[in-house]
């Protein structure tokens, strides 16, 4: 573990790499930003005291290196295309999108994400699910266009996210599969407009911050810990439930609003079949969130020793505020309907 000054250095370098990647005009500058970002997060995933914790950092480095190599090959093909007057524009764009999906952990390049997240801390999980997706998604948005390839990618993301989380007991892996499902929605929103996916990503990141703050503060890592947490008052469990259901997209909570905008936009663009399939499999994702939430409230057990280290003072102050943010969809949805009708 590094001291605060080293953490600040790596975090600053991480942010600089992301900003360089999304603001660069040439492809080489984008690649350089992604590499700075990678080299900055690797030390944050490692721990000098425990060599077993370094395993996710090694896995992450290997996958990101493969994706960077694919991006470099794509850039080379683009340069050769201009030199050789090559007319096939789909191959380099598909390679760039594939490399960015590998970096984000989107299906069908998702296999590393649940494994890495299950072995790292909650803060690192939050970074992998939010900040580390910004540069690849911005890069992917430069060359995205709805096609059969993209249709398959969107559906695979939503199906894998729905089915993969059903039999999981680790909260970190459940959030990883939820992230894969949300990536399917965000990729579909990229085909509509830049503002749509950015709004979706903002809401998604906000809800992830809320949920991970709860899990980190309450020292929760597995489902059985939630079920046996009779130490928590029913009000605290209810606030946790509202945040989880909001992330799942239950109407009329905040997490449903970006999904509604994406669905409405896709229907306007004559993609009704895609919307129906997305809704069907997202319902499965919502099911295991509801299963967690209602089981946590209904099931009561004796107090466990691991609960004594929880700092309840933080929860008493923060959870009502965070729960209120999760239910802001009630206000936002009504305002959105007024905008649609005007």
UniProtKB/Swiss-Prot annotation:
GO terms for molecular function: NADH dehydrogenase (ubiquinone) activity. Disulfide bonds: none annotated. Its EC number is 7.1.1.2. Pfam families: NADH_dehy_S2_C, Proton_antipo_M. Keywords: Electron transport, Membrane, Mitochondrion, Mitochondrion inner membrane, NAD, Respiratory chain, Translocase, Transmembrane, Transmembrane helix, Transport, Ubiquinone. One of its GO terms (cellular component) is mitochondrial inner membrane. It is found in: Mitochondrion inner membrane. Its main location: mitochondrion. The chain crosses the membrane at residues 25-45, 58-78, 94-114, 146-166, 174-194, 195-215, 238-258, 274-294, 316-336. GO terms for biological process: mitochondrial electron transport, NADH to ubiquinone. It is a multi-pass membrane protein. It catalyses: a ubiquinone + NADH + 5 H(+)(in) = a ubiquinol + NAD(+) + 4 H(+)(out). It is an enzyme of class 7 (translocase). It comes from the Eukaryota. InterPro entries: Complex_I_Subunit_2 (IPR050175), NADH_DH_su2_C (IPR010933), NADH_UbQ_OxRdtase_chain2 (IPR003917), ND/Mrp_TM (IPR001750). Core subunit of the mitochondrial membrane respiratory chain NADH dehydrogenase (Complex I) that is believed to belong to the minimal assembly required for catalysis. Complex I functions in the transfer of electrons from NADH to the respiratory chain. The immediate electron acceptor for the enzyme is believed to be ubiquinone. Belongs to the complex I subunit 2 family. This is NADH-ubiquinone oxidoreductase chain 2. The gene is ND2.
């Amino acid at each position: 573990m590094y001291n605060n000054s080293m953490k600040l250095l790596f975090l600053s370098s991480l942010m600089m790499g992301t900003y360089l990647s999304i603001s660069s005009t040439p492809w080489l500058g984008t690649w350089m930003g992604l590499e700075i970002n990678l080299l900055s997060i690797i030390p944050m995933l490692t721990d000098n005291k425990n060599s077993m914790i370094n395993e996710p950092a090694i896995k992450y480095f290997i996958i990101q290196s493969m994706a960077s190599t694919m991006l470099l090959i794509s850039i080379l093909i683009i340069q050769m295309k201009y030199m050789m007057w090559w007319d096939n524009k789909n191959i380099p764009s598909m390679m760039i999108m594939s490399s960015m999906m590998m970096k984000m952990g989107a299906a069908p390049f998702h296999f590393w994400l649940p494994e890495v997240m299950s072995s790292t801390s909650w803060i690192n999980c939050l970074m992998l699910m939010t900040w580390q997706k910004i540069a690849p998604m911005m890069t992917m948005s430069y060359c995205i266009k709805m096609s059969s390839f993209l249709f398959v990618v969107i559906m695979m993301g939503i199906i894998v996210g729905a089915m993969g989380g059903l039999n999981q007991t680790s909260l970190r892996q459940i959030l990883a599969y939820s992230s894969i499902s949300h990536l399917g929605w965000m990729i579909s929103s990229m085909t509509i407009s830049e503002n749509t996916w950015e709004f979706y990503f903002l809401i998604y990141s906000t809800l992830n911050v809320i949920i991970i703050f709860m899990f980190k503060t309450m020292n929760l890592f597995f489902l059985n810990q939630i079920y046996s947490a009779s130490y928590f008052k029913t009000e605290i469990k209810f606030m946790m439930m509202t945040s989880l259901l909001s992330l799942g997209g239950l109407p009329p909570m905040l997490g449903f609003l970006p999904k509604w905008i994406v669905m409405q936009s896709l229907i306007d663009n004559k993609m009704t079949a895609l919307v129906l399939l997305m809704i069907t499999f997202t319902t499965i994702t919502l099911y295991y969130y509801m299963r967690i939430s209602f089981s946590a409230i209904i099931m009561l057990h004796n107090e466990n020793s691991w609960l004594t280290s929880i700092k309840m003072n933080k929860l008493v102050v923060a959870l009502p505020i965070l729960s209120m943010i999760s239910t802001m969809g009630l206000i936002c949805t009504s305002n959105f309907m007024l905008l649609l009708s005007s």
